[in-house]
C-alpha cells in the first residue's frame, strides 16, 4: 500500500516575501515528504513572510483556506490570526528576517484544493510578487477487501486448479490505480486467465485496475497446471492504490491446494530382538507405496551394523548391495520385501536403521519413511558338566580342583569322592558364557593295598562333548602316589576344546 494510515499529517508550506522593491520576492513550496494528502487526515499549511534588505512595517497577510479544509488549530511566532477573516496581522519585520504562521487543517473533502495567501506592508514597493498559491490534490480513502479461493482442496500431478481472486471496494470513495500482486507457488503453471475489469500481466503476475467504485467488486480467474507435489498456494496482496486504505488487514489473502505425491511406508523388524552371540537372525524390511502417485526409482538405505554379518539376501524385486536396496518403480498400493539373513558375531546392543526414498517424486508423508529395529545380543551361557567313570579293577579315590574363569569372574570348586569299579559320578559345575576357561587338577588314588592299574574316563559336556581317557599301570596302593592330570577346557561357540 502507498498509504496505510489516515492520521499521518502532510505539511504544505507557503512562502510570502515582503520588503523594498530592491529585495522583495514571493514564492510557494510544497514539502516533498508529504505530497499525497488523504481525506480525513491532518494537514499543516505554513505561511512565511520574509523581509528583504530593508525593514518592513505593519505587515498583514491574508490566507484563504477553501471549503472542505476545516481549521482546527494555528500557531504563530508573531502577530495575531483572525479565524473568521483569515487575516494575519504580523506587524514589523526586520530586514532579512522572517515570520511564520502554521494552520492545522482537517481534510474533509477530496479532489483538487487551492490555498492562496497575500501579504502587504508599509514600504513595500513591489506588491506584484506578494501573492502565493498552493495547489494539491486530496486523495480519498477506500477499504479494499481481497479474497481468493481454490477450486480444489487437493489435487494430483497433471490436474488443473482454478484460483478466483475477488476484490471489493467498501468505500467510502472510489479506488484508483490499483495493483494486486499474485504470488504463485512453484509447481503452479498459469494456463489461462480472465478478468471482469482491468487487465492481468501474466509475466509480472499483477492485476491492474484503473478504478473501482464504492461497492463495486471485480474478479480475476487464473487456471493453473499442477506440476509439483506439496502444499501449493496463490498468495495475493494489494500492492498499490492511490487512495488511503482504512483497513489494511483485509488487503491480503491466500488459497492453497494440497498435491500429494508418493507415500512410502517402511516397516523394519528382526526375528530375534534378544539374541546371543552366534545366533542367526533375519532382518526383514517391507516397503509399501500408499500412493497416490507411483514412486519412481525407489530405494532403501539399510546398512547393517558391524555386529551382524550377512549370510544371505533375498529380495522379491530389485537388488541389495553395499547397504542400498534399489527397488525401482513402485506403483500405488504396491509393496516390496527384503530379507537379510545375518549372524550375530559379537555381543552388545545395536540398532538397524532403514530409510526409504523416492528421489523423482516428493513424499507427501515422510514420517513413515524411516524405521528402526533394536537387537540386544548377549554372550550365551552353556552348562558345564563332567562325568568321571572308574574303569579300574579297584576302587579309586578322586580329588578334583576346578578353577573357572568366566570373563574375569572366578569360580572355584573342589570334589573329593570314591568310585567303585565300573561306577561313574556326574558333576554339574554351573552355567558359563562362551569364552570361559576351566582349569582341572585331578588327583586319582589307588585304594587297594597293592599296586594296581588306575583307569578312568572323563567326559566333558559343554558346547560339545569331549572325552579324556587315562590308563596308568603300577600305581602304588594305599593312596600313596596319585595319578595327576592337569587339563584346561575352553568353551567356544565352535565347540569345546581340551588342552
Curated annotation (Swiss-Prot):
InterPro entries: Chlamydia_OmcB (IPR051172), DUF11_rpt (IPR047589), Ig-like_fold (IPR013783), OmcB-like_DUF11 (IPR001434). Keywords: Plasmid. It comes from the Archaea. This is Uncharacterized protein ORF5'.
